[in-house]
Swiss-Prot record:
Gene3D superfamilies registered for this protein in UniProt: Putative methyltransferase TM0872, insert domain, Vaccinia Virus protein VP39
Name under which the protein is recorded: Ribosomal RNA small subunit methyltransferase H
InterPro entries cross-referenced by the UniProt entry: RsmH, SAM-dep_MeTrfase_MraW_recog, SAM-dependent_MTases_sf
Location in or out of the cell: Cytoplasm
Stretches the record annotates as Disordered: 289-319
Protein's gene: rsmH
Family of this protein: Belongs to the methyltransferase superfamily. RsmH family.
Length: 319
């Protein structure tokens, strides 16, 4: 199967992608399948393909065809190899190297005999950063290992990196993003320490600056003091909340009447956007008044799933 809108030279060889670097367990898969109900056939859109777990579950569950999107070239190649190993024919899966905020039904979806984009029966979005991205120091998403301050979901994209943000943005702007995207109460202290320590090149350098910036009492918690700063920078670099707002606004136009959108979020900023969009937009009918969380068994098997929340809504027939 072909990856569309894609240059193969942008990414690492398949053996690297399929090894330790790209092993990812999809979260809340059973719950997503229960709401999207692929057993009846139909076509589905996976806007955050990752390692292909949700798409594969849809195809195994009876979906006729799936369109998969991802910004990360490594994720696309890993998923492509996984589908091939599972014997999924290319006619059932269409992959795009694409930010879901840029998806266009006519251009990127399946088409009918008249050449018109076919609306989907369901859409799944598994937001945030994946385990392979976190576990690869070269991607710069985590301070657990030393790597460049990158944090781009698409390393091939011509966009600012986290290093560009911490080294060149005004202090007041850093304070704003640490507060808004990281809900960091020591944002001002941290931003001023970053200004004094510039230039910063690696994840561990930034983590050490944050550690020194916060009061000693804040260093003794279960969560490392740099966690919220790294989250804020990642969200800012990739414009994640803006992309999510676009998805929530556009998804009703990509769905058939009654088609469902399942969104998995991992922090309160994302969940709040999903919750209010589902409640306030008359095009949505909420199917999960309260978000679903992973079972105890899933949390034990995959500790990173513990903060996941699933919300589902159906496209109203009144549009």
């Amino acid at each position: 199967m072909q990856i569309l809108n894609f240059v193969a030279a942008e990414i690492e060889p398949p053996q690297t992608v399929l090894g330790k670097v790209y092993q990812h367990d999809s979260v809340l898969t059973e719950e997503v399948m229960a709401y999207l109900q692929p057993q009846g056939g139909g076509i589905f859109l996976d806007v955050t393909l990752g390692g292909g777990g949700h798409s594969l579950a849809l195809l195994r569950g009876g979906a006729a065809r799936v369109v998969g999107l991802d910004r990360d070239p490594a994720a696309l190649q890993a998923a492509q190899a996984r589908f091939a190993a599972e014997g999924i024919p290319g006619s059932r899966i269409q992959l795009w190297h694409l930010n879901f905020a840029d998806f266009d039904l006519q251009q990127h979806g399946f088409r009918d005999e008249q050449g018109q984009g076919i609306p989907f029966d369901g859409i799944v979005a598994d937001l945030g950063v994946s385990s392979p991205q976190l576990d690869c120091p070269e991607r710069g998403f985590s301070f657990r290992g030393e790597g460049p301050l990158d944090m781009r979901m698409d390393p091939s994209a011509a966009q600012e990196t986290a290093a560009d943000w911490v080294n060149h943005r005004p202090v007041e702007e850093l304070i704003e993003i640490f507060t808004r995207y990281g809900e960091e109460r020591f944002a001002r202290r941290i931003a001023h320490h970053i200004e004094q320590a510039r230039p910063l090149a690696t994840t561990t350098q930034l983590a050490q600056v944050v550690w020194q910036a916060v009061p000693p009492a804040a260093r003794r918690g279960r969560i490392h003091p740099a966690t919220r700063v790294f989250q804020a920078l990642r969200i800012a670099v990739n414009r994640e909340l803006e992309a999510l707002e676009t998805l929530l606004a556009q998804a009703p136009t990509w769905l058939k009447p009654g088609g469902r959108l399942a969104v998995i979020s991992f922090h309160s900023l994302e969940d709040r956007l999903v919750k209010w969009a589902f409640r306030r937009d008359p095009r949505w009918q909420v199917l999960t008044p309260k978000p679903l969380s992973p079972s105890e068994l899933e949390r034990q098997r995959n500790p990173r799933a513990r903060s996941a929340k699933l919300r589902v809504a159906a496209r109203s027939s009144q549009m």
